Amino acid sequence: MNEFQISHIKNNRCIACNSLNLKVILDIGNQPLANSYHKGEEQEEYPLMLNLCFDCYHLQLSHIINPDLMFKNYLYVSGTSQTLKDYFDFFSKETLKYFPDAKTVLDIACNDGSQLDSFKKLNLSTYGVDPAENLYKISTSKGHNIICDYFNSKTINKLNMKS
């Protein structure tokens, strides 16, 4: 992010129904981004408040953080949790019970490709989309087809998925 980009904006409208009838119901104050606690270092902090829309009752954060700040250098790595990897193995087997003829899987926000690893073990072609530049090499080194970007209509066309 360069000095001219906005780090966050206050959201005054409900993201579900566009109402202005929002009220803060929880204010945790300014917080650093998730997993970015660095002992002794000055860190950027952002408002962490939960709004309730009194028209549709949707809960939402009061401030929208620039996604590049949160996701381009993502600090949580799925593969560091054995419990999560075990769950991914379970989930992939359960999923194939419902889609026994599946040959391809797409993981949106694939992180380091750990969920894709489980599907690859079951002989599926694996595709993923994730904006984390620091995790791209990890996921592609495992043989997954990854687009390092946010998921949208342009990125889906870049994948060249084979069904």
Where are each of the predicted segments found?
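Conserved SAM-binding motif I beta-strand of class I
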Residues: S125-D130
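Conserved SAM/SAH-binding beta-strand->alpha-helix loop
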Residues: A132-N134
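N-terminal juxtadomain amphipathic helix
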Residues: N2-T83
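Conserved alpha-helix/loop element of class I SAM-dependent methyltransferases that forms part
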Residues: K85-A102
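Conserved SAM-binding loop of SAM-dependent methyltransferases across substrates and taxa
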Residues: D112-N123
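A short acidic, Gly/Pro-enriched loop at the edge of an enzyme's catalytic core
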Residues: N157-S163
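Conserved class I S-adenosyl-L-methionine
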Residues: A102-N111
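Conserved SAM-binding strand-loop segment of SAM-dependent methyltransferases
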Residues: G143-I156
